[in-house]
């Protein structure tokens, strides 16, 4: 441990806590997530935020781009969630993200946002798949990028589970890219956009 500390590595949780950020610049203050950190699991606001993006995914929507498994044509409640996804995309224009986690609780800290984040990531992926199936590659591109950006909101969190959820959200949204690629639907310009986005992701650095 001393050897690695001499090289600059940190082993205490205080050294990896993300710095405070201005509220108006903080994605975590989005109306979709802020109620989760009132830490009142019995309140209607907490429950609504927790379940906001929860959908039951039918077996026909199971897929895995790593195994070469495509999705069937997507039919879901797009109209119901479209306005929420639009607002969420707008919230992601804020330059920072720091959830009000009780870091003083160490590795026992409650992370109520992770399930909601993953569910929202799934919705961006489903929306992009629906757009792609209709030939709307521009819309599919934007939804996919939004899903990836959502996952990257977790990049500074020092918890292993946060990084696993981050990776899961990225994987979910890589699916539409892969499907469009094997179907030769993306333009050269769109592929360049994807390449630049993928190159900006550093899972080891956080």
What are these regions, as identified by a protein language model?
Residues 1-206:
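Aromatic-rich surface patch/π-platform used for binding flat ligands and interfaces
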């Amino acid at each position: 441990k001393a050897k690695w500390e001499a090289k600059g590595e940190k082993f205490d949780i205080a050294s990896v806590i993300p710095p405070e950020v201005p509220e108006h610049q903080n994605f975590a203050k989005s109306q979709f997530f802020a109620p989760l950190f009132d830490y009142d699991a019995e309140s209607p606001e907490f429950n609504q935020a927790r379940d906001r993006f929860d959908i039951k995914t039918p077996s026909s929507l199971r897929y895995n781009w790593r195994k070469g498994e495509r999705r069937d044509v997507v039919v879901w409640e797009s109209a119901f969630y479209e306005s929420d996804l639009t607002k969420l995309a707008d919230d992601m224009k804020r330059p920072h993200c720091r959830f009000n986690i009780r870091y003083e609780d160490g590795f026992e800290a409650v992370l109520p946002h992770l399930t909601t984040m993953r569910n929202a990531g799934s919705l961006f992926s489903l929306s992009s798949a629906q757009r792609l199936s209709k030939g709307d590659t521009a819309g599919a591109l934007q939804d996919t990028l939004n899903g990836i950006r959502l996952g990257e909101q977790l990049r500074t969190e020092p918890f292993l589970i946060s990084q696993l959820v981050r990776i899961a959200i990225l994987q979910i949204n890589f699916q539409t890219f892969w499907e469009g690629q094997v179907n030769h639907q993306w333009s050269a310009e769109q592929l360049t956009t994807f390449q630049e986005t993928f190159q900006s992701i550093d899972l080891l650095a956080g």
